[in-house]
């Protein structure tokens, strides 16, 4: 299952490059969540259905859906459009590193020596690629990808406060539904105004 997960996650950046050649990042995100919501809804039904959300927990789901699934993924797609798929994937692989740091700061989770070594190695790897690489790098793409990492990590740490109350499938489904609510009008704006004004623009900063 881990190998399947790695394969699917890695292929996202390759598939996204093709999709972003014909659609803007917001539209790609909308299509992605439309499919995901249908799949997760069916899976949740098979698992027995949804549990009622406690009123005080909605703020965490809004953070997950708004910042995590909506803004963060649009930035990720924007970065993928402006960078090579491998470089975008490399920057976004910093998510576990930033999540560990934020969890230590805000949730008081302990960072082990193993975590420290992993963080240092990851940062050195990214520095070598970004700071010493010979290829030309689009800094707007880098900033989009880094912004995506920060927002996704913040949303991931925030949702941990209620992770023990609900099935992960339900949490993901509700977060994606919230993201889709934002995505639909944003995609309309992107296609009606942005694409019409700049027909060749398919990414942030293009």
Language-model-detected regions and their locations in the chain:
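Glycine-/small-residue-enriched transmembrane alpha-helix faces in small-molecule transporters
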Residues: 1-27, 136-161, 182-183, 201-206
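Specific transmembrane alpha-helical segments of multi-pass solute transporters/efflux pumps
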Residues: 7-8, 12-13, 41-92, 128, ...
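Hydrophobic residues within membrane-embedded alpha-helical segments of Major Facilitator Superfamily
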Residues: 7-8, 13-15, 35, 67-71, ...
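Membrane-interface helix termini and inter-helical loops of multi-pass transporters
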Residues: 14-25, 49-50, 78-85, 127-140, ...
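Membrane-interface helix caps of multi-pass small-molecule transporters
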Residues: 18, 42-45, 74, 78, ...
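Structural motif at transmembrane-helix junctions in multi-pass transporters
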Residues: 20-28, 73-94, 164-170
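Hydrophobic alpha-helical transmembrane segments of multi-pass integral membrane proteins
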Residues: 27-42, 46, 63, 115-121, ...
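Hydrophobic transmembrane alpha-helices of multi-pass small-molecule transport proteins
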Residues: 40, 62, 102, 111-131, ...
